[in-house]
């Protein structure tokens, strides 16, 4: 491996070394605060070396990885989200009696898997990254093993994820049988030169891969696990599952879609269009029926993945820009929303029912305000980053003339307003006497509160003045296209 390859791979090398080092620290000396601080230092170092890797990008590390601005941008997003989740989770994990330190080891390992996905340029590295991410998530979901819902969430995710991995492997086998190649670049060359004798096996393999990835992204009809798993998982793990896990898989999917020239495969486009419509409508309609905050946000997440699929199908520069910008917005909004749930919850008492948030403004006004901003942004209200993200997707859809998808996109956004406003109204209702008596007078975790405040600031700042972020994202899109 050359020095340039080594420099380009620094973020991946550092996160790997950090995971191993933290494992040894936990094995030798158990101290929750020390483990958390070591995790923060590791993630900050991973972020600090990204500019060094960017200086030598684009760098192909054959045959598995490509380190370009696109991969590094998503790595930065992954590490930043993991950093925020670490800060949000500290107060929550202090309430866990049984060995809270391993949580941070698993968080770093899951982040490693996600970062590998962002840099993958080969089906082998795709599968490696996906399995590291998935196995870490199995353990994280069932981490409070004394609680039945958490164990149930872990087992459900394990069984269904195993099935999706099998479909993924079968799809890879079909593509290899047809093309003799597993690298994304090799596939791109074969397709551009028309070297395929028949596209039947190739399209069947691609469809199976999309099915396997669709489970991870909880597209309809692969979404049935999402609400139960979100509800049963510890609050900080739910935040990770909703953001880092899905963001990394979608980053990989977008690279694969561009490399295989997805818009030229009519059958694939029709299939994904049906999935997008079903995902948007099902996510929003099912969210209307829920009284559990985690389940509402789970179905909201499903709907937002449908919105992102519209931008994916739009393709082109504007489509890639829309996807990337929306992921930044999505990370901020969902980290903030699940962050509020995290700082109010503990391992023994999750604040997840709508009734738990009724009248929150009257005893936690700051937290109610932050939650309100996050929900308004998820709904796409102007002056928030969510509005800019939705406008970007709409513009990409108009440029690609995806009228049916745009109509569904608008209808889904209107439906979403109802369940977001339902939560907001509950936040500001006058609490009952019993509710006031149950309100906890204890102070909120300082690090979690500061993290939420910073997320809210970014949400408003990039909603009002998104130009600097847009310029970065345009450079990222050019690196992929």
Swiss-Prot record:
It is a multi-pass membrane protein. GO terms for molecular function: NADH dehydrogenase (ubiquinone) activity; NADH:ubiquinone reductase (non-electrogenic) activity; quinone binding. The keyword tRNA-binding does not apply. It is an enzyme of class 7 (translocase). It is found in: Cell inner membrane. Keywords: Cell inner membrane, Cell membrane, Membrane, NAD, Quinone, Translocase, Transmembrane, Transmembrane helix, Transport, Ubiquinone. Its EC number is 7.1.1.-. The chain crosses the membrane at residues 6-26, 36-56, 71-91, 100-120, 123-143, 157-177, 200-220, 234-254, 268-288, 296-316, 323-343, 368-388, 401-421, 444-464. The keyword Cell membrane applies. InterPro entries: NADH-Q_OxRdtase_suN/2 (IPR010096), ND/Mrp_TM (IPR001750). GO terms for cellular component: plasma membrane. One of its GO terms (biological process) is ATP synthesis coupled electron transport. It catalyses: a quinone + NADH + 5 H(+)(in) = a quinol + NAD(+) + 4 H(+)(out). NDH-1 shuttles electrons from NADH, via FMN and iron-sulfur (Fe-S) centers, to quinones in the respiratory chain. The immediate electron acceptor for the enzyme in this species is believed to be ubiquinone. Couples the redox reaction to proton translocation (for every two electrons transferred, four hydrogen ions are translocated across the cytoplasmic membrane), and thus conserves the redox energy in a proton gradient. NDH-1 is composed of 14 different subunits. Subunits NuoA, H, J, K, L, M, N constitute the membrane sector of the complex. Belongs to the complex I subunit 2 family. HAMAP family: NDH1_NuoN_1. This is NADH-quinone oxidoreductase subunit N 1. It comes from Nitrosococcus oceani (strain ATCC 19707 / BCRC 17464 / JCM 30415 / NCIMB 11848 / C-107). The lineage of its organism: Bacteria, Pseudomonadati, Pseudomonadota, Gammaproteobacteria, Chromatiales.
């Amino acid at each position: 491996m050359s020095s340039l390859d080594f420099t380009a791979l620094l973020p991946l090398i550092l996160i790997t070394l950090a995971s191993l080092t933290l494992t040894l620290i936990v094995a030798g000396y158990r101290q929750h605060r020390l483990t958390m601080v070591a995790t923060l230092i590791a993630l900050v170092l991973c972020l600090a070396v990204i500019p060094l890797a960017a200086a030598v990008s684009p760098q192909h590390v054959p045959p598995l990885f490509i380190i370009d601005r696109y991969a590094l941008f998503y790595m930065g997003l992954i590490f930043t989200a993991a950093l925020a989740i670490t800060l949000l989770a500290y107060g929550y994990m202090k309430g866990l009696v049984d060995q809270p330190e391993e949580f941070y080891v698993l968080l770093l390992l899951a982040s490693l898997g996600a970062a590998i996905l962002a840099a993958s340029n080969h089906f082998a590295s795709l599968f490696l990254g996906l399995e590291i991410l998935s196995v870490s998530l199995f353990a994280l979901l069932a981490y409070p093993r004394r609680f039945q819902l958490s164990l149930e969430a872990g087992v459900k995710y394990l069984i269904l994820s195993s099935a999706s991995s099998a479909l993924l492997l079968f799809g890879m086998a079909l593509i290899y049988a047809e093309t003799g190649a597993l690298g994304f670049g090799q596939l791109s060359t074969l397709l551009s030169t028309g070297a395929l004798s028949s596209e039947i096996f190739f399209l069947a393999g691609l469809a199976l891969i999309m099915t396997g990835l669709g489970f991870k992204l909880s597209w309809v009809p692969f979404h049935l696990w999402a609400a139960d798993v979100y509800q049963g998982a510890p609050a900080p793990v739910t935040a990770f599952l909703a953001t880092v896990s899905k963001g990394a898989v979608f980053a990989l999917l977008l690279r694969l879609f561009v490399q295989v020239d997805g818009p030229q495969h009519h059958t694939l486009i029709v299939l994904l269009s049906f999935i997008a419509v079903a995902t948007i409508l099902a996510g929003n309609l099912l969210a209307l029926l829920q009284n559990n905050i985690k389940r509402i946000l789970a179905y909201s997440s499903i709907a937002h993945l449908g919105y992102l699929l519209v931008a994916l199908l739009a393709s082109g520069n504007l489509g890639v820009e829309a996807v990337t910008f929306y992921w930044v917005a999505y990370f901020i909004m969902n980290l903030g929303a699940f962050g509020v749930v995290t700082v109010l919850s503990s391992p023994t008492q999750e604040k997840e029912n709508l009734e738990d948030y009724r009248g929150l403004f009257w005893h936690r006004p700051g937290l109610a305000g932050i939650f309100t901003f996050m929900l308004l942004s998820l709904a796409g209200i102007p002056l928030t980053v969510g509005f800019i993200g939705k406008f970007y997707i709409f513009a990409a859809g108009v440029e690609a003339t995806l009228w049916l998808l745009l109509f569904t996109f608008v209808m889904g956004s209107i439906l979403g307003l109802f369940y977001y406003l339902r939560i907001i109204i509950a936040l500001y209702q006058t609490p009952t006497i019993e509710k006031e008596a149950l309100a906890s007078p204890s102070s909120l975790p300082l690090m979690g509160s500061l993290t939420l405040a910073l997320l809210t600031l970014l949400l408003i700042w990039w909603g009002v003045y998104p130009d600097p972020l847009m310029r970065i994202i345009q450079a990222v899109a050019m690196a992929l296209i």
